[in-house]
């Protein structure tokens, strides 16, 4: 099946994404990796009137150490967790668990934020 028609927006900043989300709170869905959302749309289980694609927002894709804490952005790919030395050093359980998330192709697209939101 194909998804129902929808508008597609690719904001370049968090502020642009928030404006779109505020204007279309009840009808928009956020697209990160798409592993859960796209199949649900194809089966028309989910029929948003708008997709807000966060993939151009580089401010959400990071791994950094700051003030003795490890910070991971919501758009950081699961594959990054598997190979980033800072993750291995500071979050070894996360690093060891990541290869068990689906197949490498899925980890290449899946984001840490999407994984958390999907479980929520």
Regions found by a protein language model. Name each.
Residues 1-120:
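C-terminal structural segment of proteins
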């Amino acid at each position: 099946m194909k998804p129902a028609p929808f508008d597609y927006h690719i904001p370049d900043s968090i502020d642009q994404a928030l404006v779109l989300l505020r204007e279309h709170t009840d009808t928009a869905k956020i697209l990160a990796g798409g592993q859960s959302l796209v199949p649900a749309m194809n089966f028309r289980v989910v029929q948003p009137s708008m997709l807000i694609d966060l993939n151009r927002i580089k401010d959400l894709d990071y791994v950094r150490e700051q003030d003795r804490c490890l910070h991971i952005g919501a758009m950081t790919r699961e594959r990054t967790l598997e190979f980033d030395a800072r993750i291995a050093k500071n979050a070894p359980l996360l690093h060891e668990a990541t290869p068990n998330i689906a197949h490498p192709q899925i980890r290449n697209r899946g984001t840490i934020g999407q994984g958390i939101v999907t479980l929520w």
